[in-house]
Amino acid sequence: HNDARRQRQMCIRDRVYSSKQDYFDWLERLEQFEENINNAYKINKRGLSEGYTQPKLVTKGVVAQLESIINSEIQSNPYMKVFIEADENLLTEDEKAELINSAETLIENKINPAYKKLHDFLKDDYLINSRDSIGIKDIPNGKEYYEFLARFYTTTDLTPEEIHNIGLQEIQRIRSEMEEIIRQVNWDGDFGSFLNYLRTSPRFYYDNGEDLFNAYLIMSKTIDPLLPKIFKEFPRAPYGVKPIPAESAPFTTTAYYNSPSPGRPGYFYANLYKPESRPKYEIPVLTVHEAVPGHHFQISIAQELENVPTFRKYQGITAFVEGWGLYSEELGEYINIYDDPYDKFGQLTYDMWRAIRLVVDTGTVSYTHLRAHETIHHL
């Protein structure tokens, strides 16, 4: 969910604009985006020539995203919004008009043509040559590269097979806890029928994105006063909750966090696209994972550390970053945000999701591939 295109949009949208110069500085940065997009074209073209490609599934998604940007009305283009919505207390009417006209010209004459060039290459040349498989083992030296990635992201010497087996063990553990919840709610049916109930019953879903967003706001403010029960130190940086922008929501994950910077809070972004597919029982676990005491605490406190090298304040090691997120989900037990058994099942659902990923991801690059599919089929 964190591709370069979305990062470009986020770096504009999440910046604090506190002076006239801030807007003109960002217009100057926007002028560099054409080169950035052209570099993506060159890198992907080289990768294709050397046999390094993305799966077809990924390529199709990127092509669709690029089409949505290229075909959007100029006034709704994500790069225009910051200038259209600029604070009129910081700009004169003429200055705002100058910014809008300059950005519009830049988008029409440079940025969109660069996106069109990248789009056409991906659609006409790259897609047909993209991998049918999703396993990175199918690129040159892919198996060895995957083994390196396993060491890098886990900070251990665990092999993919060992990680695979850990995932299988976790699936068994989590499944037994799920079965206990099913007994607690006196469900008259098997495991599969219970899952179907959770996925289809209107009681677990909001009718619209506004109600879903308000539920996230309420949950975050419910958690805030409970945190002194489990923490003594708090980050100085505040946090907020925002919806994931509509232009990227269909293509990205359920939620994510964007760290604070001087003058700007950290933000927990919630996906409101198709609220009928986003269950209420996921709201508590997502909030403690992405916001507090999850990534906001972990990242903000690290940034505020004193007497440590700067790189240590910003270095993100996946085993720790996501490990903290899972730890925060467990802390939800201590502040009773899973007092409803369905909310607890929601937390276990995310636990199960991670365990399944361990099995499936490692299974795509080793002889355990068939075993991974058998496991998921059983579930």
Predicted regions, residues:
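Long, amphipathic alpha-helical stalk/connector segments used for oligomerization, subunit docking
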Residues: 334-371
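Post-HExxH zinc-binding segment in Zn-dependent metallohydrolases
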Residues: 299-300, 311-340, 358
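Conserved functional hotspot residues or short segments at active or partner-binding sites
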Residues: 15-156, 160, 165
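Short pre-active-site segment immediately N-terminal to the catalytic Zn-binding motif
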Residues: 272-286
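Single conserved hydrophobic/aromatic residue that forms the stacking wall/gate
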Residues: 2-8, 12, 369-372, 376-379
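Active-site-proximal, well-structured secondary-structure segments within enzyme catalytic domains
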Residues: 109, 113-267
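Catalytic Zn2+-binding segment of zinc metalloproteases
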Residues: 292-305
